[in-house]
Amino acid sequence: MSNIMLKVEDLHTAYGQSEALHGISFEGHANETVAIMGRNGMGKTTLFKSLMGVLPLKSGRIEVAGQDVSRDESFRRVAKGIAYVPQGRMIFPTLTVEENIQTGLENSKTKRIPEEIYALFPVLWDMKRRKGGNLSGGQQQQLAIARALVTDPKVLLLDEPTEGIQPSIIKDIAKALNEIRKLRGITIVVSEQVLSFAMDVADRLFVIEGGRLVHETARDKTDVNHIKAYLSV
């Protein structure tokens, strides 16, 4: 499979003197979803913050659609095609749903929200005049993803998108992510602890442990019990 959208090579990230990521390497292709599985404290969020430029790299290289973004500030990475939905559903509680999505259109020539966004997340259409702070957790997560998508990314990073969300909404999010990927041909990278969700969306699964990728498998070859062993304390 060619058409690499995200290439991560030998990534090392440190908090002060303490190294947190030890030589992480992986690729994400167009129209592919990759899951990074792991328990809390194993490096998932550190990896995403490093990919986004929130944390500086100690060494290594990150490419988006062939462009080196390793030394770029976060906003330049966004301009080159990375979108990031951090853990905890970062939305603007006092803005309406529609206004929240429009904040992702700041650099766009038009302020019009593409119709496909509401087609992917019908609940947002129904609630577009409602304040973000009045949505449920699952609705806020869909809003955060919608806002990231209007930046027209090549790579979409989702840090634990199912955290604290009821199972029926998790299914909706999985369905939307699968549609987005096909529709746009983008790479989606999710960090996750819920294996059933990862199996619904990911083509390939990695396990991160102690800041290293220790296991990789294609979805159809996944040994569920093997991965569950990594996820249980």
Predicted features along the sequence, with ranges:
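The feature captures the beta-strand-to-loop junction immediately N-terminal to the Walker
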Residues: M37-R39
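Conserved ABC transporter NBD signature motif
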Residues: G60-D68, K80, T110-P114, A119, ...
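Helical segment within the ABC ATPase nucleotide-binding domain
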Residues: K171-L183
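ABC ATPase signature
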Residues: L95, L135, A148-L149
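ABC ATPase NBD coupling module
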Residues: D68-R89, P114, D126-R129, K221-I227
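A short, proline-enriched helix->beta-strand linker immediately N-terminal to the Walker B motif
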Residues: V150-K154
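Helix-to-loop junction immediately C-terminal to a conserved catalytic motif
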Residues: M52
